Amino acid sequence: MWEACYFLDVNGLDFSSGDGPRGGNHTEGRGMSKQATLQELEALLDEERLLKYQRVQAAQGRLLSLGAGALLRLAVMEFLSGGEGKKARRLTLKTLLSLTEKLPKGKTEPIRYRYGKQGKPYFENIPLYFSLSHSGSAVMLAVSEREIGADLQEMKKTNWEKLSERFYAEEEKERLHRLLEKNPERAREEFFRLWCLKEAYGKWSGEGVTPYLAFPLLQDLKSEKNDLREGRLSLGDQTYRYAVYQSEAAKQSKEQK
């Protein structure tokens, strides 16, 4: 079964000094190099992802949207070319571009999408499932030949205690309180860990995270029937938690949605 997981750091390129989406102003000197790289990355986007990208106004948001679309193209190209899927690959926008340039140019057929009842996206013409997530300056893409859900969370400063009290199940709150008394940093990371797990499961199911926030999922997700991968990731100066979830149980298909 073909599977791959990509982590992309979008730092290193920006839209300052006039750099922007296709059709924006060109800049002189060093900016021209950035503009050329951006245009090459934009050329990787399928029609739908390009429209989404062009609608984003914030500079960081544009880079994240650009990275997501380019990752989708890279994954499809690697799958169609018979390349081996890798479960954890760290990329920058420039290394992503370099990888696509090494793949057969004929493997760039149009990508079309369809959507489930709750808005979950699917490839319409590629036999792969995918799940996208972004946080901070990073984008995560997980792809597989079976249903998949993935989430990435930057462990930024936030009032996580208040959020856990509002959203988490009682046993999860108790666990976090016990950890907080012994090791506040570990408790903070556990909060993000649980959030990632719930998001990944919600994306796998196609129902989103809302139905599962107050439901204690951890033991169920660790069942023998489930494939759960999670961990900590450092990209640049930022630290993230991530989770990837799959299961043979209650497997949902495009036709069922």
What are these regions (language model features)?
Residues 1-257:
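Core catalytic alpha/beta fold that binds nucleotide/phospho-ligands
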